[in-house]
Amino acid sequence: MRHNPFRVVEMFEETMADYCGSKFAIATDNCTDALMIAAKYLKVEEVTIPARTYLSVPQSIMHAGGTVKFRDYEWEGIYQLEPYPLWDSAKRLTSGMYIPDSIMCLSFHIKKLLPIGKGGMILTDDEELVYFAKRSRYEGRHEVRMDKDNIAILGWNAYMTPEQAARGLTLMHNYPTHAKDIPNINSYENEPYYPDLRNFDLFKDCETVK
């Protein structure tokens, strides 16, 4: 085959890295898997996150082998998965947003700022993470047929499809230089967008810290 369709994914990754200000960008199928892959790479242990965030964030930490702790505080746009240099950036997408030496995870859900429909992205300056994430997102291989590569690491089915990447490239063509964060208020009911996750049985044993 003359052209690998996953070249479109690479083009989208390059576009997002240039826009956000990171050296590298690794596309995934959603922000949750981006967080899980990054957490796996960091070998997280105890991770502190806000008590009000999206349900899958603490689950991604647990799947990566970490323990979740909650803290009561308000956040806007992004927050850190403390004490690691890992940021949930699902509600922010603006030029130059990348924090040097960090790992920032984006969302392209239909309700997010770049509404591809589904998709996520890891922003990083760490070349070793690029190798790990690009292989692990695609079942341990590069974007080739399985008989054309050696599978040396454990991976997941967490890659972005060329179709999603093509839509992302199209939307970025007219995306503004600066965009405001998505607010954490439910516009329909004028109440907090996220419930307190400590009320769910899954997280009832998670410690709350100050």
Mark where each language-model region is:
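Conserved N-terminal alpha-helix of the aminotransferase class I/II PLP-enzyme fold
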Residues: M1-N30, I182-V209
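Alpha-helix N-cap/helix-start capping motif
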Residues: F6, D29-T32, A51, E127
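Phosphate-binding glycine-rich loop
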Residues: V9-V47, V57-A64
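Short, acidic/glycine-rich phosphate-metal binding loop used to engage nucleotide
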Residues: S22, C31, E74-W75, I110
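Short, well-ordered alpha-helix to beta-strand connector turns
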Residues: S22-K23, E82, P100-S102
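PLP-dependent aminotransferase-like
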Residues: A39-Y98
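Active-site region of PLP-dependent enzymes
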Residues: L93, I103-K210
